[in-house]
């Protein structure tokens, strides 16, 4: 890692120039001069003889100096590099939804709901469970990845309110993940919507899971769900579903919604988008602008 030199006044500018002009190749990045440099001593070169000695940025303003100093620094890799994410930003949105898919991957229901939310002014990051959970994960590992995604996209898209949405496999995992988020990240989450919630969660996609065969690694959802604030939760299920936890949750003060159809809710995407938007609005802080 080679340093960047800054000449802050006439004398500093002359010294920075001299250092670059006499530097060994690739030992400094260059010099930025925040004003005219003083004259060099007799016999001293002020210009580098080779590009490998570095560059000299003349008469640089404060921002140009700052940019020149930062440019050569190694950029940190996002903590979630390589995760199977789908970005759907909504221009000007202050709201961010993280949508964790079912174990079939990023399919028509996930795509449709996410696109509908973006049309309503909510930025969405989709999370492909099939690709992510094809290797065995732990709740702690997945929660750490989720925290990194939330923190990065809040910063990148200037979002201050977060909604967590899970469908099927993703819904089963979501209570485990929320409970393991760092407190500061958890505080940014306004609502959690669980679509097609089951009784047990798995942290690895398997063929047996597609066939409905339980795994010895499955963990019960109810103990984790009991730790969540009930007011922020929405549980949606299809009237034809036979094995869903949602109906039993209404007695706990959790909002429960029944739709037509089975586990895919008759593919009524507009109705699902409206339910999710309404849950977000109910849990938004007082005075927050509504999504369009």
Question: Which sequence ranges carry the predicted segments?
Answer:
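C-terminal catalytic histidine-bearing segment of alpha/beta-hydrolase fold enzymes
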Residues: 43-88, 137-140, 253-292
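Short glycine-enriched nucleophile-adjacent loop
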Residues: 1, 171-184
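Second-shell loop/turn segments in exported
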Residues: 102-104, 131-140, 152, 163, ...
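Short, surface-exposed "cap/lid" segments of acyl-processing enzymes
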Residues: 80-82, 86-130
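The feature captures the conserved acid-bearing segment of alpha/beta-hydrolase catalytic domains
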Residues: 3-51, 89, 199-261
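Residue in the alpha/beta-hydrolase core beta-strand immediately N-terminal to the catalytic nucleophile
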Residues: 161-163, 167, 190-193
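Active-site loop/turn elements of alpha/beta-hydrolase fold enzymes
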Residues: 8, 122, 127-132, 197, ...
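Alpha/beta-hydrolase active-site loop
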Residues: 109, 136-164, 172-176
């Amino acid at each position: 890692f080679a340093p960047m030199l800054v000449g802050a006044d006439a004398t500093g500018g002359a010294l920075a120039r001299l250092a670059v002009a006499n530097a060994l190749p690739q030992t400094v990045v260059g010099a930025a001069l925040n004003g005219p440099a003083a004259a060099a001593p007799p016999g001293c070169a002020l210009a580098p003889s080779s590009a490998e000695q570095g560059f000299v940025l003349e008469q640089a303003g404060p921002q140009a100096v700052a940019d020149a100093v930062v440019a050569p620094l190694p950029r940190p890799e996002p903590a979630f590099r390589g995760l199977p994410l789908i970005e759907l930003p909504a221009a000007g949105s202050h709201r961010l939804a993280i949508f964790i898919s079912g174990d079939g991957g990023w399919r028509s229901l996930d795509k449709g709901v996410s696109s509908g939310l973006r049309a309503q002014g909510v930025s969405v990051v989709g999370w492909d469970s099939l690709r992510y959970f094809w290797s065995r994960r732990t709740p702690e590992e997945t929660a750490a990845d989720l925290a990194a995604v939330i923190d990065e996209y809040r910063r990148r898209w200037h979002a201050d309110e977060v909604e967590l949405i899970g469908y099927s496999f993703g819904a089963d995992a979501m209570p485990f993940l929320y409970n393991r988020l760092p407190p500061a990240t958890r505080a940014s989450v306004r609502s959690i919507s669980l679509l097609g919630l089951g009784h047990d969660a798995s942290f690895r996609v398997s063929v047996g899971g597609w066939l409905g065969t339980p795994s010895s690694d499955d963990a019960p959802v109810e103990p984790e769900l009991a730790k969540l604030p009930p007011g922020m939760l929405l549980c949606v299920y299809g009237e034809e579903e036979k094995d869903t936890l949602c109906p039993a949750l209404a007695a706990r003060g959790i909002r429960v919604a029944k739709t037509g159809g089975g586990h895919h809710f008759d593919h009524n995407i507009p109705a699902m988008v409206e339910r999710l938007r309404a849950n977000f609005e109910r849990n938004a802080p007082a005075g927050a602008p509504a999504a369009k």
